[in-house]
Each structure stands twice: as C-alpha cells, then as structure tokens.
A protein has these predicted regions:
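Short, charge-rich amphipathic interface segments used for partner binding and complex assembly
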Residues: 14-60
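Short, charge/polar-rich alpha-helical segments
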Residues: 1-20
Length: 60
C-alpha cells in the first residue's frame, strides 16, 4: 500500500472546509469567549493565506 499525496486543490478544499466549520462554531458560540477557537481560526487563516486564498470572501 503506497502513500498518496494530496494535491494543492485538495488541500485548499479541506482547509476551506475546516475554516467554514470553525466559523460556524464561532457564530453559534455567540458572545462566549473561546481563546482556543480564536487561535484555531487564526491558524487556519494563515494557512489559507499561504495557499493564496483570500479569506475575506468566505468569512461569515
């Protein structure tokens, strides 16, 4: 069984999906502070930026 590598398109799609999930969680949290969630969102934004994705277009 060989190791399959992920294409850039697959990586971008998975990372966008992750960002969308985190945004939905943040939105459903209301005004409750969640530092771990905020940090996860920041990391995901950094990854998407590195991959050339403009997150302003996909932010809730």
């Amino acid at each position: 069984m060989g190791v399959s590598e992920m294409t850039d398109k697959e990586l971008i799609t998975i990372t966008i999906d992750r960002y969308a999930e985190l945004q939905r969680i943040k939105q459903s949290n209301g005004n409750h502070e969640n530092k771990e969630l905020d940090y996860s969102i920041k990391l995901t934004i950094a990854k998407l930026s590195y991959l050339g994705v403009n997150v302003e277009d996909i932010t809730l």
